[in-house]
Amino acid sequence: ASDVFDHQSPNADEVAFAKNVMGYAWGGNQASCTGEVYTIPTAVKQIPGYTDIKYNNELSNKVYCVESPNSIFASDKLSMPFMRYTENNRNAGIVSRREGYRTAVLGFPFETIVSREVRDLLMKQILDFFASEN
């Protein structure tokens, strides 16, 4: 998420794409130290909330370490947070219902979710949201 915003002079087209197409705005780096997030109840019924998720924030031989996760915000009324960092309740994930498509953006790499079962569940929920009519 920070690749677009975290520059001395962010590219205006990239910022507009993130906000107007993807539905998110950057909230800052180093959003969490614990590597723990949770989903929250929203109007998106496919992602019901109350799922605790751990992403890798330590050195590991299985997956790389997330050293500086991002906090992100919904950029408009079409977007909403669906995930927060456990330690401070900053937004860790945003979903968006756009005209003709859906988006989901995380403040950390999806592949660093430690539990395969939780990773599979979240992917299913996101894909169900993408396929939904409402």
Tell where the protein language model's regions lie, with residue ranges.
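Residue-level preference for alpha-helix termini and adjacent loops
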Residues: V4, G49, V63-C65, I72, ...
